[in-house]
Protein backbone atom coordinates (compact mmCIF):
# COMPACT_ATOMS: atom_id res chain seq x y z
CA UNK A 1 0.00 0.00 0.00
CA UNK A 2 1.35 3.43 -0.88
CA UNK A 3 -0.11 6.72 0.18
CA UNK A 4 0.46 10.39 -0.53
CA UNK A 5 0.36 12.69 2.50
CA UNK A 6 -0.68 16.34 2.20
CA UNK A 7 -1.05 18.77 5.09
CA UNK A 8 -4.43 18.90 6.87
CA UNK A 9 -5.80 22.26 7.96
CA UNK A 10 -6.74 22.79 11.64
CA UNK A 11 -10.46 22.26 11.09
CA UNK A 12 -9.86 18.99 9.23
CA UNK A 13 -7.48 17.86 11.96
CA UNK A 14 -10.00 18.62 14.74
CA UNK A 15 -12.73 16.78 12.84
CA UNK A 16 -10.42 13.81 12.35
CA UNK A 17 -9.45 13.78 16.03
CA UNK A 18 -13.14 13.83 17.00
CA UNK A 19 -13.85 11.04 14.54
CA UNK A 20 -10.92 9.00 15.79
CA UNK A 21 -11.99 9.32 19.44
CA UNK A 22 -15.47 8.06 18.54
CA UNK A 23 -14.41 5.44 16.01
CA UNK A 24 -11.42 3.78 17.71
CA UNK A 25 -13.28 1.14 19.74
CA UNK A 26 -15.95 0.67 17.09
CA UNK A 27 -13.32 0.14 14.39
CA UNK A 28 -11.47 -2.44 16.47
CA UNK A 29 -14.76 -4.25 17.12
CA UNK A 30 -15.64 -4.26 13.41
CA UNK A 31 -12.24 -5.73 12.57
CA UNK A 32 -12.46 -8.33 15.33
CA UNK A 33 -16.02 -9.27 14.35
CA UNK A 34 -15.07 -9.53 10.70
CA UNK A 35 -12.21 -11.87 11.54
CA UNK A 36 -14.58 -13.82 13.82
CA UNK A 37 -11.88 -14.31 16.42
CA UNK A 38 -12.78 -13.38 20.01
CA UNK A 39 -9.34 -12.06 20.99
CA UNK A 40 -8.33 -8.47 20.38
CA UNK A 41 -6.52 -8.02 17.07
CA UNK A 42 -5.08 -4.51 17.46
CA UNK A 43 -4.06 -2.29 20.36
CA UNK A 44 -3.01 1.37 20.51
CA UNK A 45 -1.08 2.25 23.67
CA UNK A 46 1.66 4.37 25.18
CA UNK A 47 4.72 2.40 26.25
CA UNK A 48 6.05 4.15 29.39
CA UNK A 49 9.48 2.53 29.08
CA UNK A 50 10.22 3.53 25.49
CA UNK A 51 8.07 6.71 25.66
CA UNK A 52 6.50 5.70 22.34
CA UNK A 53 2.97 5.14 21.13
CA UNK A 54 2.51 1.63 19.80
CA UNK A 55 -0.05 0.28 17.37
CA UNK A 56 0.09 -3.51 17.64
CA UNK A 57 -1.44 -6.07 15.29
CA UNK A 58 -1.63 -9.86 15.59
CA UNK A 59 -0.64 -12.17 12.70
CA UNK A 60 -4.33 -12.68 11.83
CA UNK A 61 -4.74 -8.94 11.33
CA UNK A 62 -1.49 -8.89 9.38
CA UNK A 63 -2.79 -11.41 6.83
CA UNK A 64 -6.28 -9.92 6.58
CA UNK A 65 -5.87 -6.14 6.60
CA UNK A 66 -5.22 -5.63 2.88
CA UNK A 67 -8.36 -7.59 1.95
CA UNK A 68 -10.66 -6.20 4.64
CA UNK A 69 -11.91 -2.66 3.88
CA UNK A 70 -12.40 -1.93 7.60
CA UNK A 71 -8.76 -2.80 8.30
CA UNK A 72 -7.49 -0.56 5.51
CA UNK A 73 -9.72 2.31 6.63
CA UNK A 74 -8.56 1.89 10.23
CA UNK A 75 -4.90 2.15 9.25
CA UNK A 76 -5.53 5.14 6.96
CA UNK A 77 -7.44 7.01 9.67
CA UNK A 78 -4.71 6.22 12.19
CA UNK A 79 -2.03 7.58 9.84
CA UNK A 80 -4.11 10.67 9.06
CA UNK A 81 -4.47 11.40 12.75
CA UNK A 82 -0.88 10.92 13.86
CA UNK A 83 0.70 12.56 10.81
CA UNK A 84 -1.73 15.45 10.39
CA UNK A 85 -1.75 14.77 6.66
CA UNK A 86 -4.29 13.55 4.14
CA UNK A 87 -3.57 9.98 3.10
CA UNK A 88 -4.49 8.83 -0.40
CA UNK A 89 -4.02 5.22 -1.48
CA UNK A 90 -1.88 4.76 -4.59
CA UNK A 91 -1.25 1.02 -4.86
CA UNK A 92 -0.54 -2.32 -3.15
CA UNK A 93 2.90 -1.65 -1.63
CA UNK A 94 3.34 -0.78 2.07
CA UNK A 95 5.07 2.61 1.71
CA UNK A 96 3.79 6.04 2.73
CA UNK A 97 5.31 9.09 1.05
CA UNK A 98 5.14 12.70 2.22
CA UNK A 99 4.28 15.17 -0.52
CA UNK A 100 5.96 18.11 1.24
CA UNK A 101 9.67 17.61 1.86
CA UNK A 102 11.09 19.52 4.85
CA UNK A 103 14.49 19.19 6.49
CA UNK A 104 14.34 16.84 9.45
CA UNK A 105 11.12 15.22 8.30
CA UNK A 106 11.48 11.92 6.45
CA UNK A 107 10.00 11.65 2.97
CA UNK A 108 9.16 7.97 3.46
CA UNK A 109 7.44 6.09 6.26
CA UNK A 110 7.94 2.33 6.10
CA UNK A 111 4.95 0.45 7.40
CA UNK A 112 4.72 -3.11 8.70
CA UNK A 113 2.73 -3.96 11.81
CA UNK A 114 3.86 -2.42 15.11
CA UNK A 115 3.93 1.36 15.16
CA UNK A 116 6.64 2.96 17.25
CA UNK A 117 5.95 6.65 17.06
CA UNK A 118 8.62 9.03 18.30
CA UNK A 119 8.03 12.36 20.03
CA UNK A 120 4.30 12.43 20.82
CA UNK A 121 4.30 16.19 21.53
CA UNK A 122 5.30 16.91 17.95
CA UNK A 123 2.86 14.35 16.58
CA UNK A 124 -0.02 15.86 18.56
CA UNK A 125 0.81 19.22 16.98
CA UNK A 126 0.58 17.56 13.56
CA UNK A 127 4.32 17.40 12.93
CA UNK A 128 5.72 14.07 11.82
CA UNK A 129 9.26 13.97 13.21
CA UNK A 130 11.39 10.89 12.86
CA UNK A 131 10.08 7.69 11.38
CA UNK A 132 7.07 5.52 12.03
CA UNK A 133 7.95 1.85 11.79
CA UNK A 134 5.22 -0.75 11.94
CA UNK A 135 6.73 -4.21 12.29
CA UNK A 136 5.09 -7.61 12.48
CA UNK A 137 5.64 -8.94 16.01
Swiss-Prot record:
Keywords, comma-separated and alphabetical: Host cytoplasm, Late protein, Virion
Gene Ontology CC: host cell cytoplasm; virion component
Primary location group: virion
Signals that turn on the gene: Expressed in the late phase of the viral replicative cycle.
Compartment annotation: Virion; Host cytoplasm
Signal peptide bounds: none
Function statement: Plays a role in the inhibition of the host innate immune response. Mechanistically, promotes the autophagy-mediated lysosomal degradation of host TBK1 and affects IRF3 nuclear translocation to block type I IFN production.
Record's subunit section: Interacts with host TBK1.
Family: Belongs to the asfivirus A137R family.
Protein name as annotated: Structural protein A137R
Organism, as annotated: African swine fever virus (isolate Tick/South Africa/Pretoriuskop Pr4/1996)
Amino acid sequence: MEAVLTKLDQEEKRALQDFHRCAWEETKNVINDFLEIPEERCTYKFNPYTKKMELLFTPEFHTAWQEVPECREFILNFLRLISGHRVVLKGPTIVFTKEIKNLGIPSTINVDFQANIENMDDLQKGNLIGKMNIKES
